[in-house]
From Swiss-Prot:
The gene is tshb. One of its GO terms (molecular function) is hormone activity. Belongs to the glycoprotein hormones subunit beta family. This is Thyrotropin subunit beta. The keyword Chloroplast does not apply. GO terms for cellular component: cytoplasm; extracellular space. Heterodimer of a common alpha chain and a unique beta chain which confers biological specificity to thyrotropin, lutropin, follitropin and gonadotropin. PROSITE patterns: GLYCO_HORMONE_BETA_1, GLYCO_HORMONE_BETA_2. It holds the Pfam family Cys_knot. Transmembrane segments: none annotated.
Amino acid sequence: MRVVLLASAVLCLLAGQVLSICSPVDYTLYVEKPECDFCVAINTTICMGFCYSLDPNVVGPAVKRLVVQRGCTYQAVEYRTAELPGCPPHVDPRFSYPVALHCTCRACDPARDECTHRASADGDRCSKPLLLHMHAYPGQSNYIQTL
């Protein structure tokens, strides 16, 4: 009986690793600068998905070793640059944004990651007219950063 229980527990832990679905997904950023005339919709990818976590509801110093809290975060990122239209000559119209290339499940590191619990609901709104068709900045410099 104990062997069956132990085997079931091991299989559940392994299934949690296999079912950790963390991958790049399509996302639309709405970007505007106060000095420019338009809001721009930029299509990119972000890391999103499920990562295995374990947080036992038992209190004690030995339990801290059992806590596994990982989130879906960037493993490799490429930064791209877009040019925002309708900006006066004294304003830099360029905007750089991340594109997720590969994602991974790991504990959040505040020195490297943006560790937020909930995104703002206002992030998907524009206060200026929206332009839906955006072209990359002609002289854009893409660079890849592996985290």
